[in-house]
Amino acid sequence: MFGEGSRDNVALSKEGLFDKLEIGIASDITIRDKWSCGEIKKPETINYRTFKPEKGGLFCEKIFGPTKDWECCCGKYKKIKHKGIVCDRCGVEVTLSKVRRERMAHIELAVLIVHIWFFKTTPSRIGNVLGMTASDLERIIYYEEYVVIDPGKTDLNKKQLLNDAQYREVIEKWGKDSFVAKMGGEAIYDLLKSEDLQSLLKELKDRLRKTKSQQARMKLAKRLKIIEGFVSSSNHAEWMVLKSVPVVPPDLRPLVPLDGGRFATSDLNDLYRRVINRNNRLKAILRLKTPEVIVRNEKRMLQEAVDALFDNGRHGHPVMGAGNRPLKSLSEMLKGKNGRFRQNLLGKRVDYSGRSVIIVGPELKFNQCGLPKEMALELFEPFIIKRLKDQGSVYTIRSAKKMIQRGAPEVWDVLEEIIKGHPVLLNRAPTLHRLGIQAFEPVLIEGKAIRVHPLVCAAFNADFDGDQMAVHVPLSIEAQLEAKVLMMAPDNIFLPSSGKPVATPSKDMTLGIYYLMADPTYFPEDHGGKIKIFKDVTEVLRALYSGGFLDEHTDGRRDETGRGIHIHEKIKVRIDGQVIETTPGRVLFNRIVPKELGFQNYSMPSKRISELILQCYKKVGLEATVRFLDDLKDLGFIQATKAAISMGLKDVKIPEIKSEILKEAYDKVAIVKKQYDDGIITDGERHSKTISIWTEVSELLSDALYVEISKQTKSKHNPLFLMIDSGARGNKSQLKQLGALRGLMAKPNGAIIESPITSNFREGLTVLEYSISSHGARKGLADTALKTADSGYLTRRLVDVAQDVIITEKDCGTLNHIEITAIRQGSEELLPLKDRIYGRTVSEDIYQPGDKSKLLAENGDVITSAQAELIDDAGIESIKIRSTLTCESRRGVCAKCYGLNLANGRLIGLGEAVGIIAAQSIGEPGTQLTMRTFHLGGIAATSSTPEIVTNCDGILVYIDLRVVVGQDGNHLVLNKKGAIHVVRDEGRSLEEYKKLLSTKSIESLETYPVELGVKILVGDGEKVTAGQRIAEVELHNIPIICDKPGFVKYEDLVEGISTEKVANKNTGLVELIVKQHRGELHPQIAIYSDPGLTELVGTYAIPSGAIVSVEENQKVDPGMLLARLPRGAIKTKDITGGLPRVAELVEARKPEDAADIAKIDGVVDFKGIQKNKRILVVRDEITGMEEEHLIPLTKHLIVQRGDHVMKGQQLTDGLVVPHEILEICGVRELQKYLVNEVQEVYRLQGVDINDKHVEIIVRQMLQKVRITDPGDTTLLFGEEVNKKEFYEENKRTEEEGGKPAQAVPVLLGITKASLGTESFISAASFQDTTRVLTDAACSSKTDYLLGFKENVIMGHMIPGGTGFDTHKRIKQYLEKEQEELVFDFVSESECAC
């Protein structure tokens, strides 16, 4: 293959770089005349005594150039003065030895050889061109059968295969010269050469037009695409067969002599030697007129040797080297993590870098890091040498180096001078997001460890337990400038993923600040005194320090002068003309708070500190915020030291009610066990109920313990409470294990062990309890190791799919939008609207509801936090915003559709790599979460809410609910989709409320989605009050409820076939269970109005696994339970389930046991059973149109006969297939579904990611369309093309008066989308390297080097950040006009790399 950079009509930059790269198949002339510097005839490498290359061998100096600079092989010519002379004795050109890295050679083959990539890589290119199967080709290429090339006078067909016997038979019958049949590479070459591709293309297009079968059309379209590639490019099909093999330059496959006469060599040399040996042997036996059988065998062996060289192991067994290890062929050199692309081109080792252990540097400023002197000396050596020479201290580099080694005093002075204003980059692996590399001003320190500012640890995810960091020195002025302007730690205090501060105090700092700001615990009135009043802050501080610093430990005693005040004493102080009741601690804290934020007079847990930092940035800007952060750090550490908080065993209180609650729980469990023994419930239900009881106990004791330790004694805080409440360390779950009970444990498979650990760590665990708990704890550790790799791979795929999404323009001018609402679960608002719309561009004018004169946001505005608050307060439910999903930029996305850059709160700049930021934002928490599972030590985290309690007064309204009144007078829900709303009591009728709710004319105060089997305790339209129980949820079973009175008749409940009677092991009671069966049976319970069973009033399908609760002929009333389907055993939910779910969504995989969804709006009906599947029909009542669904009997239906369903609504349990949503509901619904589902996984873990990042990934998954009708365009049926390409081709066709193509959108998984990228270099470096390169070469693809990866690989500057086109043009212009202005401009640039 060849690649060439086109320089035609291209304005080259001063480096002379090319702007595009083309790949194609190399012809024999190219290999011989353009690439090769000579033919290799011998397999020898180097002489074992002299270590000099053998002449004509694989390392020949005559062909590849000299091994020593400016010296020929025989030594006749030495030194540079003979440059360019070719030695007349040895034939070696006198030049630099580095030409041995560039010069290639070739091996002249004795017989034509087929290139394995074009024949064996699927789809087989040769097979497609010739219209032959891969197995037929294999038999021809490996000399097993002949193929007819020209039938001549015979009755044979062209391309017919003949074995030896048939071949001899034809010769006997027709004579040797009457036809042409060959085998091996020669046969393939002749066939390819004789193929008229132009007429073949025409023929295929005709066939494609006439064929009606979808499968045949797809097959033809694939072949057509390959043929079209050859026709439209300069490639010839016969070039896929080789006449000569190119040989890689010798310095790229080195041979190094080791001690003891052995050699270390590249595997390629062994593979080349095999080819040369077999080739020479074949040449020799061809000269000797050897029997055909031997020649054929030798030819096959040569073909196999060349196959092994190109792709070892692709055909047959791989060739083994020493130690029975497969040799690495040319393909392996490119593939995988250690291949050329990923090892040498995308990731390079860096000079001017160091690495050391990190320790905390609390004395540092935010923009500083402590650099060990010895390390700095080594890193900045060239700079020191230059400065020493400039000063005249030394005159040569050697003497300067000696001076540095001696450690002369002037060297240290020079070093101090040099590092002023020269930033260094610190990096901690793994670099999961862009905050993993930041720039700092170095400060020289003694010792050997790097010192790091405590506040940047969160960004690096670093701690001081032996972590190491790497230091890199930016060398060029541009690099230093970018580091200073864009990468300094103070510029990176917010997370690009959510806009939340990342540089927030933690651990001791939080504790110190929280302690200082704690609520008053010393009240003078309790000690017979009065509240002290101070005229200003200075007086408070004087009293605080002059009278001795009093706190918990001094027990509130005064010194002799009586002047001391307690740090948590209740005092009054005049601030800005107002008398405020506060504590001296809070006064002390407010000294460092910027005036604009006002007086902070409340406790300060970590969450509130974070909010304060954000507020500070918005009000006073970055510089003041960084100063504030540094002050926070200092104050936090000082106060934590002074507070001297420590934890004693007695601080862990055990709730007094523990024994009582445990006794109750054991009684409840005993009742459940008895129910099971009596056969009322199944074993599964017993397990579920037991777990629910213990979960409730766990939560109850946890809350009781928290209340207990939070009770403040007169002048004492519980240190444990301080640590947890401040957010410094620990959480409620850990506290529960210390003082209440460890609770339920999980087995390694995620199932919960029924018997909980009722002891806590203060009491100590029994041996049995300890062994149970070690189960789950070990799972956590094992998961961490395994899942980190998965998460890293997910991040890599995300980066690959989104890497070329760059901000390319300010505004694309689109009118498209998406609609956004707050995210709710029941009545609880999980994510308010203001958080979702902040930083997004609105695509319509937004007015105050009911007041058109008050404009809240104008079309095209980027919503600020103040506007977001206003919109949310106005009670607006949904808003139309612009999104990257609807952006119409030709390449990348526009700034308006993206919105604010969350890392700095400004509109995103041109050239910003938003795709990579999105991938990092989604990938980084994945890794964090996988690492976080074990902190709970396998605690079972189950969710159970057995009742619904309303939080407000109002009227209860049922919407979309089918209910039946049960025997107890309560309402039982019969359908899956519906909700109960609580609305404000405005004295309207129930019908009015329902109508207003359905048209969204009024807002409900609370909404609770309810499902099948929920018992509603309040009637439709009745009044409710806050705190009232309004519904009960059945957690353990999915009930099947009767809604009409009558008599039971079993239908298709045939014992032994569709049902079985199972005797309970413990009770001996017999239960009727519906089982999975293969017969044409439809198990259901029919209800008849009379005992004679003549008039049918209703039927109820019973899914397999359900337990029938009624007898045949039994009289039933509405609300009675007919059968129950036990829910699966509860498993713990952690990101272990979450990460694969994210991967499943972004890879667009079909979920296991997927749900069926309705294809049209209509009413549900059943039509019996067919082949173990239930036939469910959705009928449109207006048009009468029907859609049939075949649903396996094992699946649980969540709709019933007569239910109204909407298009896209689930009919059965399970996860929805995203491709079906696309097909049925369209692109918008799919986008919404994917974004919400991905967010759901992260939200469960408490991880905040902005929607815009997920939207970018989803955008990349929907970049392609599939052609359904090519019209008059050049597109092919079934071809998947980029939307941009599709629209451009249609536009061109319409302009020419042709018929445009029709297409449907396609959802691709991120791996497939990455491989389908326009850049073949980027795709090849990701996965499937050989297939991607073969594909690109066959159709002579051109890579225009528009993305990041391809530019990194080619060694160009990336087209993003300061390398973005617009910025580069300005820079070049400035260089011409006024060179000194370049740097001013770049520093003002708002772009970020």
Curated annotation (Swiss-Prot):
- Alphabetized GO MF terms: DNA binding; DNA-directed RNA polymerase activity; magnesium ion binding; zinc ion binding
Keyword Magnesium among record annotations: yes
Q: Which residues are Zn(2+) 2-binding?
A: C812, C887, C894, C897
Record text on cofactor binding: Binds 1 Mg(2+) ion per subunit. Binds 2 Zn(2+) ions per subunit.
Q: Which family does this protein fall into?
A: Belongs to the RNA polymerase beta' chain family.
Role this protein plays: DNA-dependent RNA polymerase catalyzes the transcription of DNA into RNA using the four ribonucleoside triphosphates as substrates.
Protein name in UniProt: DNA-directed RNA polymerase subunit beta'
